[in-house]
Amino acid sequence: MVLRNSKKEDPFFGMFKTYAATIDRMGSDFGKIISDYHNVERAIADMKMTESECDDLSHVLLEELNNSFITPFDREDIFMITNQLDDIADYIEDTASKLQIYGVESIKDDAKEMGQLIDDATSDVSRLFYVLPEQKKNKNAMENIIEINRLENLGDAVFRRALGKLFREEKDPIEIIRWKDIFENLEDTLDACEHLADTVRGVIVKNA
């Protein structure tokens, strides 16, 4: 199966664009929550609603896949990309919810840094799906993929630093458990962005 390159956009690409743009919005909203952590109850509630929108988009995409005889690239890759987009949305919403559930009163600087990386990575995810339909823009897509990988690597470094600092400096075991879980969620979110980017890289290589 080859990537289509016609004037009329394939419906799958349109749905992927919508999905990725929604995730970009979630990443931006999460970045705002974590950088200015005041009166965030409404923002977290709104994020739950946006995550539900992503669930709906997954259902529509998979229904379209089930009903389509011809697809722009391998069905298995469409299925995987859909699930990986959903993973990103789930991790972002779950992390925001844990801030509320755990009664977090202030955000650690390392968490703010990882929140900004998530904001940046989800923006690159959105840009990736805007250039993916056009084979002549594969170079642009690969640049987005490389940038997502770079951001994930930065996140790894911040994550390791944050855990080291947490175990060295924090004396309250409950606080350690709470923040270890939050940092792991932040890391999982960046990992999910990288996994998606790697899948799209595979699609580009297979259809070059």
Regions found by a protein language model. Give the residues of each.
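Cytosolic, long alpha-helical scaffolding segments
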Residues: 1-208
